[in-house]
């Protein structure tokens, strides 16, 4: 069967540079020309994680809808949830262009965007306008590059968006903001989480509603770094981890033409590394803490492997660049078919079934 995206749309989009093509895809979703996906509800895929109901475990990762322009349109493609951002208090342009590069043979992307976004106020207006609509929409928050107090920027994000967020993600793992990953260090992370969770507690008391907070970490951590993060997280009232952000590694690439570009690598080559780190973090934090697995998800099979490695939920972004807007629905259908095939009553039963394999994998 001919895939119309791969046959017609992708060649046209790939005539443009990656950032322009991304803008065109956002514009396409806004026009409502994209047909909505009408997936039948499969209660075996539904879960309650961190107090939130997810109709299926597949989400759109942060980075696609940076300015909260199309969260509902993304849900309409079949995603069980969508995450917008990363949002910083003040608008910022990010790093100089070009700053996104396709590695077509590897179905990968390198980006050094640098938290380019329109700032809190523009996103707040858009999210306020959709506040009465259903669906889980998370808000990924970060710090301005020139912030004197980066922790204060995260606190500002919690306070500003508290009435509108299904959940928050504190993004401290982008490699494209100088010094940001230093917040993953043990003492710095403790200070950050104490401030963020105190702001959450304050806002929850006012609103009468507790919004979950996740922490997004890098795949390039040492074993000691993973130990430190687990220790800090388990000592606090954090709701979960997102594993992982993009990698600085270029291991295993076949498309070397642009592999030397600075920035974070995402897409299929990230799958093994990010899944191994996911399993190692699951082993460290135990069974109770929710984890969202991200990195190289391109099919129902890779989504299932994330779950078997310890993820409650999974996210994707880069692989949709190559597979098109039909990918989320295809994955969700594939998950249902896998449960049919194996006689599984709930996808949650598969979680952790291959943690030992993945955490032992040399990557």
Swiss-Prot record:
Substrate binds at residues 66, 111-115, 171, 176, 245-246. GO terms for molecular function: dihydroorotate dehydrogenase (quinone) activity. FMN binds at residues 62-66, 86, 140, 171, 216, 244, 267, 296, 317-318. One of its GO terms (biological process) is 'de novo' pyrimidine nucleobase biosynthetic process. Its main location: membrane. It is found in: Cell membrane. Binds 1 FMN per subunit. Its cofactor is FMN. The active site is at 174 (nucleophile). It is a peripheral membrane protein. Keywords: Cell membrane, Flavoprotein, FMN, Membrane, Oxidoreductase, Pyrimidine biosynthesis. It is an enzyme of class 1 (oxidoreductase). Its EC number is 1.3.5.2. It catalyses: (S)-dihydroorotate + a quinone = orotate + a quinol. Catalyzes the conversion of dihydroorotate to orotate with quinone as electron acceptor. Belongs to the dihydroorotate dehydrogenase family. Type 2 subfamily. This is Dihydroorotate dehydrogenase (quinone). The lineage of its organism: Bacteria, Pseudomonadati, Pseudomonadota, Alphaproteobacteria, Hyphomicrobiales. The gene is pyrD.
